[in-house]
Amino acid sequence: MLSSSPTSFTHPFLSSSPPLSPISPPSRTARISPPLVSASCSYTYTEDSPRLHQIPRRLTTVPASLYDVLEVPLGATSQDIKSAYRRLARICHPDVAGTDRTSSSSADEFMKIHAAYCTLSDPEKRSVYDRRMLRRSRPLTVGTSGLGSYVGRNWETDQCW
């Protein structure tokens, strides 16, 4: 319960009288010196081997098509595709690429080449791929009337009003 009588606090932190004497920190006679740190660095540079310059430049960027990956024209024969694959495999295969290049980059490049070869060497997969490429390259034409002019949904038709 609370009382209305005045209360006196005897705790030194809560009393209104100043402390008797300030406490000074103990003096230290020993001095600690910071540790000495030294560092050195070396760098060596070696010229790229000529083998690196044989890698097709198209593989360093994103190729436009699988034909670009294999560096063959659109109407290439199956023999052209096979010879292009073998030529690129001799350069980019991780077992042949050597230690000059990182194994992950040569493996990635070879996987792209192999995927392109698998698609383009199979006649069914190649025809499906060619149809998709043709569909992507043609712009969508919109008619002025009739059912053929429906181009799909847009923001206004997707709204539920």
Swiss-Prot record:
SUPFAM superfamilies membership: Chaperone J-domain
Biased composition (Low complexity): 1-18
Key word Oxidoreductase present: no
Protein name: Chaperone protein dnaJ 11, chloroplastic
Pfam family, one: DnaJ
Tissue expression remark: Expressed in roots, stems, leaves, flowers and developing siliques.
CDD domains linked to this entry: DnaJ (cd06257)
Transit peptide interval: 1-36
InterPro entries per UniProt: Diphthamide-biosynth_chaperone, DnaJ_domain, J_dom_sf
Domain of life: Eukaryota
Region (Disordered) residue spans: 1-31
